[in-house]
């Protein structure tokens, strides 16, 4: 899954203390939804939701917990009309878990999480498939009644390229550093540029640190005014002092640690989730965690918030065609939500929204 799903170490996370969320049942291999204890009197109006997450996966458990906590924050505000069942699985058991936990009484399934599991489930041709909001990209139109909600680094690359154009950058350079997501960011920036701008975009690859002074001095001689950066946070922090008087544009791939560590980033513009860029937005207030997580886990938390809000908005009908999400402005096309991230700017160890 995009920049948000990286190999994260196992951590002992649980739902927030005494969550108001009404869990009808947690995952137990010998039970099905139909065997859960009797429903409350208003059961016919209760929206039944299964959270299908890799809580048993060593690599994805921490990410899954963050998604679960975000969803729990939303469901906790609807405790009288939403019943949620957790259904965990390991890396090789998503189809078995779906079969075990989902029957025709379920209104929505949220999950799975992880590109491999999403692909496996979509191709499984389940005999009893319920409306399912999958949380990683599939790469093709999902089968009915499945849909995809997945944050992607590519939309952020396109957004910073567009912002650089709107900011009237005259001599921009795409700078790629060695990182896990750098090539994907670069490809998305170049794709946008070729499709919208007649002038070719110059490119450069960062070498060893002892070459940076010569490289950036050359940019100044060439009147380079904007840097579209594809790389990680640590490289950006080291490179930033060499980029004085140049506008810098980055994606969430460059923002991985706390704001306190962005001391020298003032003026850097970023395409990221509104949850991080516009954190004081009124509609987010009810869902904020007690302790703010790292930016990476915060994006996963926001994914859980959006997944829960979308299925509640849908109820037993179709998903909303457009939605102001915590991960971005969302538009549903071909059963997949296309995401438009928000542009923010770092200012003295804070992040503020750019524009209205």
Residue ranges and their predicted role:
Residues 31-69:
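Extracytoplasmic "Venus flytrap"
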Residues 81-103, 156-159, 184, 206-217:
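Structural motif
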Residues 139-163, 264-275:
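Short beta-strand elements at the ligand-binding edges of bilobed clamshell
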Residues 194-195, 222-224, 237-305:
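Extracellular/periplasmic periplasmic-binding protein-like sensory domains
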Residues 287-356:
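Segments of small-molecule ligand-sensing domains
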